[in-house]
A protein has these predicted regions:
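Conserved Switch II/interswitch segment of TRAFAC-class P-loop GTPases
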Residues: 87-91, 95-101, 109-133, 138-162
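Conserved catalytic-core segments of large NTP-driven translation/proteostasis enzymes
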Residues: 7, 169-312, 316-319, 323, ...
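Residue-level signature of catalytic and energy-coupling elements of molecular machines
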Residues: 22, 28, 47, 94, ...
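Helix-rich terminal scaffold detector
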Residues: 8-34, 88-91, 111, 117-119, ...
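C-terminal effector modules of nucleic-acid-centric enzymes and ribosome-associated factors
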Residues: 14-17, 155-157, 304-415
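P-loop NTPase switch module centered on the Walker A-proximal segment
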Residues: 2-103, 112
Length: 415
């Protein structure tokens, strides 16, 4: 059951849980936070994560107990009963592991400051999405990692050691080489204190500039009104995301780009939305000001029909006239992998061709682009849906192979 509670402070870092489907990512998040992050009705029915899930947790340290027993998510040490020192609050971004949901995982990587790669001990390593997720966060620039070897409760000692050796071999030559591998039973909350210690020692809070113009990626959006609510008592739409830089305050005027789709003179356009922040929520509580790091909910004056069912995912929020332009065309300095990732057999990546349709993840936005020109490594694409992005931003590139989008590389946006 959920033990959602107010945190002492706003979360200051986003940690993703990544890995193959059914390896226990959502169960691990629940073991740490007490919150089952897969709340969508279809997720509950099918038992897998479909949308990005979110949950927060505080981390405390007891001065009297030995590591790793000194770390917990409770203000009172569960081992000796002493009061713990509050270290920081953390937001978890629970990514789907199913191969068909790779684009959703990539959009989550845009807000991750670090990640936990969850690998189940009862299956051989690597599984296809274990390999694909690790490559994806490396392409997204996420460098700080911890590995959790899960499900040690359902294997014998021999298989647990075999699994450990498989993991060591798999991560050789990757950004995960040398990172801690923590054996865990998320189902029974075994070794969660060791996971918290590893997070503290390996995923620091990044330095951010609170004085820059604020920007926030939208990762979820909601209509919080119940059916039958009268027009007079309707609450405005809510957007959720992570502040990349700067800070927002209640009462701020904001702009949301690329905005909403409109039809004008027979053409489909996207127009930015302007609204006001009426409330801010972070760490399970209402706040007057929201800063960089962690996940934030913003209450607005928007018509809730715009925000319902994640209608504003992929937008960028900032102060009016201070956001990058909407781009219907992207010029990318592309960097392709030698082999596509995510298939059981490693398939060589061919060069991009004119007329080809590619899936692009830019920040939390997901769009399809048609290649209009290709010269050396410079690819120009016409987008089906514009993105709000600036020069130097990254775009993950996926190609359709055997009916599935497969990650084949990334590109840096050029003017």
């Amino acid at each position: 059951m959920s033990r959602l509670k107010k945190l002492p402070k706003q979360p200051e870092v986003n940690i993703g849980t990544i890995g193959h489907v059914d390896h226990g990512k959502t169960t691990l998040v629940e073991a740490i936070t007490g919150v089952w992050a897969a709340r969508h009705s279809e997720e509950l029915r099918r038992g897998i994560t479909i949308k990005l899930g979110y949950a927060d947790a505080p981390i405390y340290k007891c001065s009297k107990c030995e590591p790793h027993q000194s770390y917990s998510t409770e203000p009172t040490c569960p081992h000796c009963g002493s009061p713990g020192e509050f270290i920081r609050a953390v937001s978890f971004v629970d990514a789907p592991g199913h191969e068909a949901l790779m684009a959703t995982m990539l959009s989550g990587a845009a807000v991750m400051d670090g990640a936990i790669l969850v690998i189940a001990a009862d299956e051989s390593c690597p599984q296809p999405q274990t390999r694909e997720h690790l490559a994806a966060i490396e392409l997204a620039g996420v460098k700080n990692l911890v590995i959790v070897q899960n499900k040690i409760d359902i294997v014998d000692e021999k298989r647990a050691l075999e699994s450990y050796k498989e993991i060591i071999e798999f991560v050789k030559g990757t950004g995960a080489e040398g990172v801690p591998i923590i054996p865990v039973s998320a189902q029974h909350s075994v070794n969660i204190d060791a996971v918290l210690q590893a997070l503290e020692e390996n995923i620091p809070t990044p330095s951010r500039d609170p004085d820059k113009p604020p920007r926030m990626y939208v990762v979820r959006s909601f209509d919080v009104n119940k059916p039958g609510t009268s027009v007079e008592t309707l609450t405005g739409g809510v957007i959720g995301g992570s502040i990349l830089q700067g800070r927002f305050e209640a009462g701020d005027e904001i702009e949301i780009r690329p905005g909403v789709r409109v039809e004008k003179h027979g053409k489909t356009l996207y127009e930015p939305i302007f609204t006001e922040i009426v409330s801010l929520h972070a760490g399970g509580r209402k706040v007057k000001e929201a800063q960089c790091g962690g996940l934030v909910g913003i209450g607005t004056l928007l018509d809730p029909s715009l925000t319902k069912a994640d209608g504003l995912i992929g937008n960028l929020v900032g102060k009016p006239n201070m956001l990058p332009p909407n781009r219907s065309e992207l010029v990318l300095d592309s960097h392709l992998l030698e082999r596509a990732i995510g298939t059981k057999e490693l398939v060589q990546v061919d060069r991009v061709n004119k007329g080809e349709r590619l899936l692009l993840d830019v920040g939390t936005a997901i769009t399809v682009g048609s290649v209009v020109s290709m010269k050396n490594d410079i690819v120009t694409l016409q987008l089906a849906r514009p993105v709000c992005a600036e020069e130097g931003d990254r775009a993950a590139i996926s190609r359709k192979m055997a009916g599935r989008w497969r990650l084949i590389g990334y590109g840096i946006i050029k003017e």
